[in-house]
Amino acid sequence: MEYTLFESSPIFVGLIGYLVYFYFLKNEALQTGFRNYLSESKSSFYWIQLTRILAFSCMAILPLLYIYLLDIYFWEIDFIWTYADTKYTLILAALLIPLGAINAKGKDHLVIYPQVRMQKWNATEYNFNILSWGVYLLGYEFLFRGILFLGILPFVGLYPAVCINTVLYALAHLYKGKKETLGSIPLGIVLCIITAQTETIWTAFAVHWIMATNNFVWSQYYRMKENNNNL
C-alpha cells in the first residue's frame, strides 16, 4: 500500500516539534531571562517543569492537531493498554530498577542528574516533578514509539523501522553524553520490538516513566548524601 507525502507529513511535524523543544531547552539566553524572574533556589525547578510542558506540546499536541485537523485517517490514534503491556512492563521494570539504582551512584551520572537542582524539596514539588516527567515522557514516546516507529512501519517494514527509530533515538541522546547515547541503542531496539508486538506505546511509556522516577529518586538521594558528606 502506498501513502502520500501528505499522509506521512506528521513525521516531519513531530521532528520539527522536537527541534523546537530542543532549541528552547538549550537556549541559554531564554533560560537566563526566565530565571531572572524567579528566586535562585526555585529557578531550576520551574525551568525544568516549563521545558517538559513545552516538550509535550511540541512532540504530542502539535502532531495530533495536524493529524486531526487535516483528517489524515491513516494516523488513527487508538493505543489501548493490553495484557502484553502489563507483562513487558513488569519484566523490564524488574530488570531496570536495580540497575538504575546502582548507576545513580556514579559521579559522572550525578553531574547530569537530577535535572532539578534544589537543596530543599517539599512533598508537592517532589511529586509534581515525578508527574511532569510522566507528561514529558508521554509526549516523548508518542513521538518516538508512536509517530517515528508505528507511523513509519507501513512505509518501510519492521527492521528498517527499528533501525531508523534507533538512530533517531540515539541522536536525541547525544547531548547527554556517550554513556547515555550508547545505552539508548539496546533499550530503543527492545522498546521498538515490544511496541511492534503490542501495537501500543504504553509499555515504552510506562517503562520510561518508571526509569525516570527511579533515577530521580536515587540521584536525588545520592546527591544529597554527597552534599552532606562535604559539609
Please report, for each region that a protein language model flagged, where it lies by residue:
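Membrane-interface starts of transmembrane alpha-helices
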Residues: 9, 43-55, 124, 128, ...
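Hydrophobic alpha-helical transmembrane segments in multi-pass integral membrane proteins
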Residues: 61-69, 132-142, 192-207
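N-terminal, membrane-interfacial amphipathic/helix-forming hydrophobic leader that caps
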Residues: 1-78, 217-231
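Hydrophobic alpha-helical transmembrane segments
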Residues: 8, 12, 86-91, 127-130, ...
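Juxtamembrane helix-loop-helix connectors linking adjacent transmembrane helices
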Residues: 37-42, 68-136, 150, 154, ...
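Functionally important transmembrane alpha-helices
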Residues: 26, 162-172, 178-231
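Membrane-interface helix/loop boundary segments of multi-pass membrane proteins
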Residues: 108-118, 139-164, 193-200
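Membrane-embedded alpha-helical segments of multi-pass membrane proteins
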Residues: 12, 54-61, 90, 143, ...
